[in-house]
Amino acid sequence: NLLQFNKMIKIMTKKNAIPSYTSYGCYCGWGGRGRPKDATDRCCFVHDCCYEKLTDCSPKTDIYSYSWKSGVITCGEGTPCEKQICECDRAAAVCFGENLPTYKKRYMFYPDFLCTDPSEKC
């Protein structure tokens, strides 16, 4: 769920998801359109695509199990939905961590109306 995703982000980046990733670029936060602004925004684009594939799941509310040790997040046992949601969230948190060096504060609270490029397909 979103609280677990927030915790994963904190583990991998040392940043709070709110405000650092809730409205970053064109894809971090609710919805998304246009072309991702940078590598961090692309992490959100890929995460959105991952959630889109989970048609019979509730990724924002379903609770899953995971563990963290020495900077490695591992998804635990659960239903197929729980495992898939966890993997989507884990991959995004890892992606955020890998792209911290290029994180740009100017893309925080980026206005949607500036996301005018044609959208990419998942």
UniProtKB/Swiss-Prot annotation:
Chief place of localization: secreted
Enzyme class per UniProt: hydrolase
Keyword tags: Calcium, Disulfide bond, Hydrolase, Lipid degradation, Lipid metabolism, Metal-binding, Myotoxin, Secreted, Toxin
Binding site for Ca(2+): Y27, G29, G31, D48
Stored Pfam families: Phospholip_A2_1
Example GO BP: lipid catabolic process
Domain of life: Eukaryota
EC number of the protein: 3.1.1.4
GO molecular function: calcium ion binding; calcium-dependent phospholipase A2 activity; phospholipid binding; toxin activity
Disulfide bonds: C26-C115, C28-C44, C43-C95, C49-C122, C50-C88, C57-C81, C75-C86
InterPro entries per the UniProt record, alphabetical: PLipase_A2, PLipase_A2_Asp_AS, PLipase_A2_dom, PLipase_A2_dom_sf, PLipase_A2_His_AS
Note accompanying the cofactor annotation: Binds 1 Ca(2+) ion.
Gene3D superfamilies on file: Phospholipase A2 domain
Cellular location(s): Secreted
A cellular component term, taken from the record's GO annotations: extracellular region
Family (UniProt): Belongs to the phospholipase A2 family. Group II subfamily. D49 sub-subfamily.
Stated role: Snake venom phospholipase A2 (PLA2) that shows myotoxic activities. PLA2 catalyzes the calcium-dependent hydrolysis of the 2-acyl groups in 3-sn-phosphoglycerides.
Protein name: Basic phospholipase A2 Sms-N6
Organism of derivation: Sistrurus miliarius streckeri (Western pigmy rattlesnake)
